[in-house]
Amino acid sequence: NKIISTQYLMEDLTQELAGLEAFLAHLDENSAHVTYNGRMFDVPFIRNRLHYYGNSSSKLAIPHLDLLYYSRNLWSDKLPNCKLQTIEKEMFGLERQGDVPGQYIPDYYNTYLTEGNIGPLIPIIEHNKQDIISLASFLEKIYAEVNGD
């Protein structure tokens, strides 16, 4: 029972295609996307970036489990909203400390690019790590609720 996570760092934007291709190399017939609003954001974003580089890989056409939709179906009547951090707090008692809000992540990365200081990347890495841990917990809880466990 462990989570293995790989995060790719592009030291500059010229490495974007290499990062995307490294991501695709990890996908195989046993892969699935598990996201939170990834159906509307992450997967289309990745697909658009690949398309920009002339790569129309079919590797993104794998099963996709967007937990936002399950969360809305299961908990929207019990919670004030179905934001990831609301569910973390209300369903799991987790409250992120010192987390960088997702909308600021591009600014943190751009600061890294312009200043060459890796400091702004640390909160991004921690944010991503917490997202992954939360999604694994959500998946387990959703599975239990759907199956009556």
PLM features: what roles do these ranges have?
Residues L84-G148:
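Acidic, Mg2+-coordinating catalytic module of metal-dependent nucleases/exonucleases
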Residues I3-E90:
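Conserved DEDDh/DEDDy metal-dependent 3′-5′ exonuclease domain
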